[in-house]
Every structure is written in C-alpha cells, then in structure tokens.
Amino acid sequence: MAPTNLTKKPSQYKQSSRKGKKAWRKNIDLSDVEQYMEKKIDHEITHGTSDITSLQNDALFHVDVEGDEILKNKLIKRKQIKKVLKSKEILDAVKTNSKIAALNHHKNSSGNPNKIQGVSKHELKKLMALAGRVHGESKIKNRVAKDGLVKTTAGDLWGEESNSKKQKVKLPSGIKLDVEKKDQIPEELLKKSTTSWSTASVRPSTLDIEPIAVKEFTEIPHAGKSYNPNNKAWSELINKEYKEEKAREDERIALEKYKERIRHLMETLDDNEEEESSSNEEEEEEEEENENENESTQCSGSDKEIKLSINKPVKNKKKTKYQRNKAKRHEEKVKLQQELKELRQRVKDLEEVINSEETEILSAIESDSNKVKKSKKNKKHKLGTKYSVIDERLEIKFSDELSDSLRKLKPEGNLLYDTVRKLQSSGKVETRVPVRKGRKYKQKITEKWTHKDFK
C-alpha cells in the first residue's frame, strides 16, 4: 500500500514569546516530532510494522521484470530495439504456459534404434576396426585399406639422398662443396685455405682470460647521493669528496709552483752569463791586485813597529756582490740538477717495476695456460693509451641544496657518462681523447711586390 499523503497545517507566523516561561512552553514548535510520528504510522500501514529495520530485503524491495512500457515504445520508434509481434507473443505464451509437450520431427528424434549417439552402427564398426577393437581383424590392414599406404623404405623427401653419388666437403675457409665420390680431392685444398680467411679450428685461449680491471667501479652509488640521504652517509660522502678534491688541488698548486720556478730560472740564467762572468772576474782581479799593493805598502811601513805574533793578522774578507750572486746561482743550478737526477731515477725505477710485472705476468701465463685467469688491477688506470680512465664526477649536494620533496628535485648524473666510465674501468673500451688535427706545414708569410706596378 502506498504511503498516504497527509495534508499539513498551513504555516503561521512564528513570534517569539513576550510573556514568560509559561507562554514559551505553550507556544513550542513540535513539527519535527509530528512528522516522525506520521512516518511511523505510514510504515505500519504499508509494511505492517513501524520498525522497518527488522524486515528482510524481500519485504522492502521487488525486482521489476516487465520494464517501463513508455520507454519501450520510445526505443521501438527510434528503431533501437525490434518490435515483438502479437502473434509471436501468443505463441511464446502458449509454449511457456501449455502443459502439453510440443511435437518432435522424425529427423530430429533421438530415439533411432540403428544409431548410437547419432552415429550409425556400420560407421561405428569401421571406426572400431581402425582402432583395433574388433576381434579377428588386423589394425594395420584396416589402416592400409583406408589410407592406401604401401610398404617402402622410409626416406625424407626434402633431405639428402642416401644413395647419392656426391659427397660434401668442407674447406678450411668454411665453404662447402658437392664433389663426386670417384673424384680425388688434393690434400692442399683440404688443409690450406683458398681465401683470405679461415674458420677457427682451435678454441682461442683468450676466452679463458677475464678482462683487465683497469679501475675499480662501484655499480651501486653511495647512500649519501640520495635525494633524501641519511645524515651520517651524507657527511661521510662530503668528507671523502673533500679529501680527494684537496689532494688534486694540492698537486695542481705544487705543479704550478714548480713550473713558475723553472720559468724564473730560465729567464734569469742567460746564455751570455759566461762572458759577463769573465769580464767581471777580470775587474775583480784588478781590484784584488790594487788591494794587495796597498797591503804591501802598509806592511813595509809597519815592519818598523814591534810585533807580538809572527803570523799575519787575520782579516774578515767580505765577498763582493758579484761573488754572492754567482754563489747563489751556482746553488740553484746544483739544486735543479739534483731534482732532475731524482726524477730520472724515479722514472727508471718505475720502468723496472713495469718490466718486472710484465715478466711475472708472462711467466704466470706460461705456467697456468689452462687455468682461468683472475681479473688484474691496473695501478695506473691506463689500457692501450697514455690516457687514464675518466674520473667520477662530483655529484654531491650541500645542505641548502637538499630538497625536501620530489617536486623540487633536480636530476643529477649522466647515464651515458657512467656507461662509458664502466666500459673503460672494466677494460672493454680504451680511453680516448678528441685531438684536433694539426697543420702539416707551417704557414709562410710573404710580402707581395704588386704595389710597385702603380708607381
């Protein structure tokens, strides 16, 4: 039963009480309570109980099977669904509502005594004979009768002929030839290659040798390089990178100082030094002779005086400016020669170490030729060229550069750079540096004399 639509009282103007507590109690608004009570009465009329939560779903809802007729007619007009004819509706109603079974055609009837599951007995006997289920009949004979097989030698139609008069010969270069059996093939053709190449017959020993580990390469980056790193890992990375960069900077500064020193020596030590020194020496000798003459005159005058000692008096002979400069230059020359000597000795020691390492490697290869070699570490980080493996880039962020969210994150590193460094470190690729092609000959500047034609 549908809920009854109760007409509500017309709403009146609500004025706040002007009297007191009694008037307020008298004029209180009870519209919400009245609505709730009316709803309860409606539920009691429609569902038989005021509390509908205790009822099952079947009592509250029902499924509409028929559908909306108005909507159906609209869809038929738009040709979105087909219109069901009245005759078909009557026949469908008879089919569903009639208690008498429909008539079956003799062709569709399954109660044929000569057929088993729709297969005739004659056809079934043939199938049983092919399967070898009939007593007294051969399975092979039935198969031959059906397929028409003939007993012959088994042979692959697309394969090689078994009774062929030709044989295949493989040359050292890998070329295959069809040669008749009666023909004799020369041994030179079988042993020596007729082309500029030949197929490998022996397994190369280099397959057992691992590539040389030129430089250590870490696959997983340091934890301090994360976009949100741990404080301990980040400080470790900062200290590590600082030490490496400081060592490089100290080496660079020392090299610059050494170059500046050599340049200064080359500027101060001129080629005309010997000529200048000889002229200065002559001047100094003349000065010394004059001093000796003065001393002799003084001595002759002082012979008359009384002497306490037989020996000549000791005099502090002061060096001239030229002598001091000469001694200073000599000291610098000696020091430079000593440094060059030490450098030569160091280079010689390095060459001896390299030669000894090479001899050790050769002896190890000869002794353990069949064993798999371990990866050798190269101390100089060089392979095949004079250039060492490219260094790892400085990929570190300071405390103010660290981002607290992925939106502010800036990508670091270069995948191509890391791949090349990995290939160079593992010894698979040699280190190369782009070099500009120089001039074959020096440019010659000449003055043209064409301006004389206008005079």
Curated annotation (Swiss-Prot):
Residues 16-25, 314-328 have a biased composition (Basic residues). Its main location: nucleus. GO terms for cellular component: nuclear exosome (RNase complex); nucleolus; nucleoplasm; nucleus. Keywords: Nucleus, Phosphoprotein, Ribosome biogenesis, RNA-binding, rRNA processing. Disruption phenotype: Inhibition of cell growth. Defects in processing of the rRNA components of the 60S ribosomal subunit and accumulation of the corresponding polyadenylated pre-rRNAs. Some delay in the maturation of the 35S primary transcript and 32S pre-rRNA. Delay in 20S pre-rRNA formation and a severe delay in mature 25S and 5.8S rRNA formation, with accumulation of the 35S, 32S, 27S, 26S and 7S pre-rRNAs and a 5' extended form of the 25S rRNA. Complete loss of synthesis of the mature 25S rRNA. Appearance at a low level of aberrant 23S species. Shorter 18S and 5.8S rRNA at the 5' end. Residues 268-294 have a biased composition (Acidic residues). Residues 1-25, 264-333 are annotated as: Disordered. Residues 1-15 have a biased composition (Polar residues). Pfam families: Nop53. The modification Phosphoserine is found at S31. One of its GO terms (biological process) is rRNA processing. One of its GO terms (molecular function) is 5S rRNA binding. The keyword RNA-binding applies. It is found in: Nucleus, Nucleolus; Nucleus, Nucleoplasm. It comes from the Eukaryota. Interacts with CBF5, FPR3, FPR4, NOP2, PIH1, RRN3, RRP6 and PAP2. Interacts with pre-60S ribosomal particles. Late-acting factor in the nuclear maturation of 60S ribosomal subunits, which is required for normal acquisition of export competence. Required for the export of the large subunit. Acts to stimulate the RNase activity of the exosome complex, and may recruit the exosome to 7S pre-rRNA for processing. Associates with numerous RNAs including the 27S and 7S pre-rRNAs and the box H/ACA snoRNA snR37. Also interacts (via N-terminal region) with the mature 25S rRNA and the mature 5.8S rRNA. Present with 1600 molecules/cell in log phase SD medium. Belongs to the NOP53 family. This is Ribosome biogenesis protein NOP53. It comes from Saccharomyces cerevisiae (strain ATCC 204508 / S288c). The gene is NOP53.
